Amino acid sequence: RRNMMNNKNAGNILADLQRLIDNGISIHTQVVLCPGFNDGKILKKTFRDLVALAPMVETMAVVPVGLTKNRENLPELRLFTSVEAQNIISQVEKWQDECRAKLGKSFIYLGDEFYINAGMNLPRAERYDGFPQLENGIGLSRNFLDEWENSSAAPTGCDKIENALVPVGESAYKLLKPLFDEYNNKYKTGHKLVAVTNHFFGKTINVTGLLTGRDILNAVSDFTEFNRIILPQVVLNKDLLFLDDISLTDFKKLYKGKVECAQNAKELKQLLAKQGG
């Protein structure tokens, strides 16, 4: 931790956590897992150290390191392989079972990227215990899939539906493509899910929330037969700005078509079912 953060005090994290606990503060923790640095035996020790601080340490999230293209003079890191992701899932599932028996909850939760990278099914919703780290992206995919499944929104007049482009990160594309194929086949619509390559931060950054306005515009520019786009709300901040400081207002001017935003699966399904006009 000291090496990765280039901070001689970064190794004092357990003392820092204990100080918070001593002052009555409960904590949700997150580990950014890096191959060869803090995985394997180090991850096991981290888990043991944190679970020993339960219940004041309420949860432990584990997410894979994301590497941007801007890494000059930084420690050399790499991404996890699919096999490594499978092994991590297998180990964490054992710890979850142990915690569910002792604490009544999983306690340790993996980022969605591990399951997508491993090509494995996401855990059931109950394994997320109410999604306490949803804001950190833990269980976001499971939450979306269940919300999509439970939403009853459907076209009432398919011939009047205005087909839309839906840009997402490459990770979400793998998850959502089967849903879109099934939807289009069922309702005879022609909505288009678009996988957007992240040129701003680097091609290995594949989450939707880190897409920029310009990268989205570039990705949809070839689909001139569409005049409507549905943006995931997560690409905008509270001031309706993308990460490259393009405003939603400017985006609408540049796209020159209808621009709508969906906060979640329910809203997306409602917009997909919306009639044109």
What feature does the model see in each segment?
Residues 1-20, 26-38, 57-65:
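Core AdoMet radical
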Residues 13, 43, 85-88:
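Aromatic/hydrophobic pocket-lining residues that form the small-molecule binding cavity
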Residues 13-16, 46, 176-179:
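Hydrophobic side chains in well-ordered alpha-helices
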Residues 24-29, 160-164:
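Short, surface-exposed connector motifs at secondary-structure boundaries
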